[in-house]
Amino acid sequence: MEEFQRHIELDRSWQHNFLYPLIFQEYIYAFAYDHGLNKSILLENSGNSKYSLLLVKRLITRMYQQNHLILSANDSNQNVILGHKHKKNLYSQMITEGFAVIVEVPFSLLLISSLGEKEIVKSHNLRSIHSIFPFLEDKLLHLNYVLDILITYPAHLEILVQTLRYWVKDASSLHLLRFFLYEYRNLNSLITPKELISFLKKRNQRLFLFLYNLHVCEYESLFVFLCNQSSYLRPTSFGALIERIYFCGKLKYLVKVFTKDFGVILWIFREPFPHYVRYQGKSILASKGTSLLMHKWKYYLIYFGQCHFSVWSQPKRLYINRLSNHSLDFMGFLSRVRLNSSVIRSQMLKNSFLIENISKKFDTVVPIIPLVGSLAKAKFCNVLGHPISKSVWTDLSDSDILDRFGRICRNISHYYSGSSRKKSLYRIKYILRLSCARTLSRKHKSTVRAFLKRLGSEFLEEFFTEEEKALSLILPRDSSISRGLYRGRIWYLDIICIHNLANDE
């Protein structure tokens, strides 16, 4: 980021929020391909059209020419960009990838300036996503209902442009973004919003992630603000909160007259806001209120999406579940609140009593079926979970194969270290371990049994001992606390994203 700031010469352009001139800078395309500012890498790959510096120079030169952008979106077969029909897709891809870097500039500079004003970075800026689970463990034990919410992509592309307009004042950049979005849509007049999102993901993942994160940020900021100010909302905007007209009057009346008989109703009015947690596009609302209260929030969210983002969600797509008999699928874990009963014998004088205590426990379980499906999709096993060789890796060296399998196994083990039950995690490790052995034996044209017999029992030992090695650096091996942690749940403070296999769709 420091190199990025040093090489971006905004000066007067940034003072007026002009980002469009950056599209004519060569280093922008170097950033788009994750090569930093090392132009020699581009020169070394001059035979590859995607990384050719010559093509970047040619693209910029022709953009400077008059009538540089000639593109008809009505007929994709006749489209011509920059006067070269056969290079239309290549040049269009280069411009969109460079533009994805450019639109991140205002947010990057704002982040740098905000961090520069503070000597110490606040802890919430460095918070691990694993910190969500201790929060859920602390809160969900006292709640009753949970509402699963999926923040969908807006059907109207203009909403994305309008959202970015609050941050970027450069009209040329906004017009260029609008041009790209409508070009994708006009490639097929019958394309649906869902197909458009899938196409945009494949065409330019960086631009898609930026726009989607910006949309989610806008959604969440408005939602939290309106929830905090819900008592001041006008009923014409949100039909679900029409009773807010008489909210204060009803509350005073209930407090004065029905305090003794309607304590539950009073509690609903006094504490209407549930706990809210979000990761990426999925969020949950949990409350200790009644089912009626959760249904109110459900229809409030539907009206909120319709009024602000033109997202027409079906009520059946928002699920209200009771925590006592429902598993919550969130961030790659299956979480639930389990009831534990224990019987205690108590004796008073000559009489003995059996006292049954019921306590709640927050369980986080590894979803074995989705994980095995992800491993099968990645060609580590078949659909039944039987390990197979990774044939595309047989051309690599033995050390590279071991390093790749070991890294995947360590990442999965690291992420699912907070699981209440480790048996499913051991099965995943077994699949990866045997898949690695099959891959190496296939490379050396040998059987798995002969290959393992030749290498000995220490082969791939790190697949199962990585977590123990990490803990042994912190606690003595023979301590009772250490032995408990090997079997218990561990939440780490350095995890910033879900592992790909856990987040696979």
From Swiss-Prot:
Name the source's superkingdom. Eukaryota
Q: Which UniProt keywords apply?
A: Chloroplast, mRNA processing, Plastid, RNA-binding, tRNA processing
Q: Which InterPro entries match?
A: Domain_X (IPR024937), Maturase_MatK (IPR002866), Maturase_MatK_N (IPR024942)
Where in or outside the cell is it found?
Answer: Plastid, Chloroplast
For this record, an example GO cellular component is: chloroplast
Chief place of localization: plastid
* GO MF terms held by the record: RNA binding
Biological processes, Gene Ontology terms? mRNA processing; RNA splicing; tRNA processing
Which protein family is named in the record?
Belongs to the intron maturase 2 family. MatK subfamily.
**Function according to Swiss-Prot or TrEMBL:** Usually encoded in the trnK tRNA gene intron. Probably assists in splicing its own and other chloroplast group II introns.
Q: What is this protein called?
A: Maturase K
Q: Its gene?
A: matK
